Curated annotation (Swiss-Prot):
SUPFAM superfamilies: Class I glutamine amidotransferase-like, P-loop containing nucleoside triphosphate hydrolases. It catalyses: UTP + L-glutamine + ATP + H2O = CTP + L-glutamate + ADP + phosphate + 2 H(+); L-glutamine + H2O = L-glutamate + NH4(+); UTP + NH4(+) + ATP = CTP + ADP + phosphate + 2 H(+). Mg(2+) binds at D71, E139. This is CTP synthase. The keyword Nucleotide-binding applies. Belongs to the CTP synthase family. It comes from Thermococcus kodakarensis (strain ATCC BAA-918 / JCM 12380 / KOD1) (Pyrococcus kodakaraensis (strain KOD1)). Pathway: Pyrimidine metabolism; CTP biosynthesis via de novo pathway; CTP from UDP: step 2/2. Homotetramer. The gene is pyrG. CTPSs have evolved a hybrid strategy for distinguishing between UTP and CTP. The overlapping regions of the product feedback inhibitory and substrate sites recognize a common feature in both compounds, the triphosphate moiety. To differentiate isosteric substrate and product pyrimidine rings, an additional pocket far from the expected kinase/ligase catalytic site, specifically recognizes the cytosine and ribose portions of the product inhibitor. Residues 1-265 are annotated as: Amidoligase domain.
Length: 533
């Protein structure tokens, strides 16, 4: 019988429900249970694909092409797994499905309502995923009390009745602030949040109390008393330097063991040795390198969350800690490349639109001409081609037709299959595609094999009409699409300390124990630049 753990949030948003959910899933998987995570997003968008990174953070892309919430990236990294588009349930998906069924007459003339039709659709989607697993962790986005999340909380309440209380548990993540004036942790916000949750028919089985420092015993006792939750199930989750410490914290606090007992699962010791070694190694690193990320969304670091994590994974692999220098591309346009002085490596990440493109190309040129390790991703790959066309081939005015439709040298152009589309959502070249890597290249050395599958999210590509000119000038296209040999996937510059760019997003498949090869190579080159071989 599948066991369900619903994770809800209270008091304020941004407490780390995603990391908590990922950690719970990882700890059950470490006990040998077949485990997966589901994220519920109460917004009306069908998916995350058209959402502004400043509002929602990065759009994470799955193997099957799903454009999803960044929390699914955390799930994949913590559980070392690959999820599907169905693992992200949104209000937009649910309502679209119900309306489509109503139009087809599947409800036999019934009045279609939130209860039971919307809640039934939610439950069916959760159960569809759950069939192949022992434990399913379901994170319900938003904060208890939000109108948007009401149908999902109601569906979760119903599932506890239908599946049996012994098969469904609730974990509520709350905030316990410390008021400087009185110097004590305040539990009243948690009490009121649980009161709100109980008014919806849900009694939490465990409370994860987020705080700046460890939860005091007096606060733990008070939370237990006023929320009807055992003291052992009031979990202290205080701020830590590295999110990968959270599973170890929750394990020490006894949360997974308590939930296993609550759900009638057999007691098992978790295999956390490799994870613990990874965390301890990262904390012990003393040597550092500084890598600049030159982008258009750097004011919100979550816009590039998977890149941050890939650099962290590569830190452990290379025995050196990466310090990130966040640089707004438009600031490079205004202040020049002096903003890049002293860095050991440069990344130009993906993005859309004209803002900051010249600044990004200034950063690319600076890396190319000064032998600074460089990695370009997606739009960064395309702008690397544009920069090379302008400053090496001498093609004045060369550009991508995305930015300049009238450019005399369209070295980056819209893919043919994209030209007649009339909608934005879900229509890009999305998901995992095969990439064929040429022998005797940097890319082949990094990946160690001929064919790799990497995740994509783009509409534009290198114009194949210009490939020969680039290669004659010394640029090497070392990776080619497996589904179209005219589509360039990886470029590199021989003789440079490290200069590589990819049309795909390597960060989406990076894992704590298995860093993405191009990130690992970048950090290795940055370390060599700073400290020598």
């Amino acid at each position: 019988m599948t066991k369900f753990i619903f994770v809800t949030g209270g008091v304020v948003s941004g407490l780390g429900k995603g990391i908590t959910s990922a950690s719970i899933g990882m700890l059950f998987k470490a006990r040998g249970f077949r485990t997966t995570n589901i994220k519920i997003d109460p917004y009306l968008n069908y998916d995350a694909g058209t959402m502004n990174p400043y509002q929602h953070g990065e759009v994470f892309v799955l193997d099957d092409g799903g454009e999803v919430d960044l929390d699914l990236g955390n799930y994949e990294r913590f559980l070392d797994t690959s999820l599907s588009f169905d693992h992200n349930i949104t209000t937009g998906k649910v309502y679209s499905a119900v309306i489509e069924k109503e139009r087809k007459g599947e409800y036999l003339g019934a009045t279609v309502q939130v209860i039971p039709h919307i809640t039934n659709e939610i439950k069916e989607r959760i159960r569809r995923i759950a069939r192949d697993y022992d434990v399913v962790v379901v994170e319900i986005g938003g904060t208890v009390g939000d109108i948007e999340s009401m149908p999902f909380l109601e569906a979760a309440r119903q599932m506890q009745i239908e599946e049996g209380r012994e098969n469904v548990a609730f974990v509520h993540v709350t905030y316990v602030p410390r008021l400087r004036v009185v110097g004590e942790q305040k539990t009243k916000p948690t009490q009121h949040s649980v009161k709100e949750l109980r008014s919806l028919g849900i009694q939490p089985d465990a409370i994860v109390a987020r705080s700046e420092d460890p939860l005091e015993d007096s606060a733990r006792r008070k939370i237990s008393l006023f929320t009807n939750v055992p003291e052992e199930a009031v979990i202290s989750a205080y701020d830590v330097e590295d999110t990968y410490e959270v599973p170890l914290m929750l394990e020490k606090e006894g949360l997974p063991a308590y939930l296993a007992r609550r759900l009638g699962l057999p007691e098992r010791e978790p295999d956390l040795e490799a994870w613990r070694e990874m965390v301890e190694k990262y904390k012990s690193l003393t040597d550092t390198v500084e890598i600049a990320i030159v982008g258009k969304y750097v004011k919100l670091a979550d816009s590039y969350l998977s890149i941050k994590e890939a650099l962290k994974h590569s830190s452990v692999a290379n025995d050196v800690k990466v310090k990130i220098r966040w640089i707004e591309a438009e600031d490079v346009e205004r202040q020049g490349v002096k903003l890049l002085e002293g860095v050991d490596g440069i990344i130009v990440p993906g993005g859309f639109g004209a803002r900051g493109t010249e600044g990004k190309m200034m950063a690319i040129r600076y890396a190319r001409e000064n032998n600074i390790p460089f990695l370009g991703i997606c739009f960064g790959f395309q702008l690397t081609v544009v920069e090379f066309a302008r400053n090496v081939l001498g093609l004045e005015g060369a550009h991508s037709t995305e930015i300049d439709p009238q450019t005399p040298y369209p070295v980056v152009d819209l893919m043919p299959e994209q030209r007649d589309l009339d909608r934005l959502g879900g229509t890009m070249r999305l998901g995992a595609y095969p990439v064929h890597i040429k022998p005797n290249t940097l890319a082949r050395r990094l990946y160690g094999r001929e064919i790799v599958y990497e995740r994509h999210r783009h509409r534009w590509e290198v114009n194949p009409d210009y490939v020969e000119k680039f290669e004659e000038a010394g640029l090497v296209f070392s990776g080619i699409a497996g589904d179209d040999e005219r589509r360039m996937e990886i470029l590199e510059l021989p003789g440079h300390s490290y200069f590589i760019a990819t049309q795909f997003h390597p960060e989406f498949k990076s894992r704590p124990m298995r860093p993405a090869p191009v990130f690992r190579g970048l950090v290795e080159a940055a370390k060599k630049k700073k400290y020598g071989s």
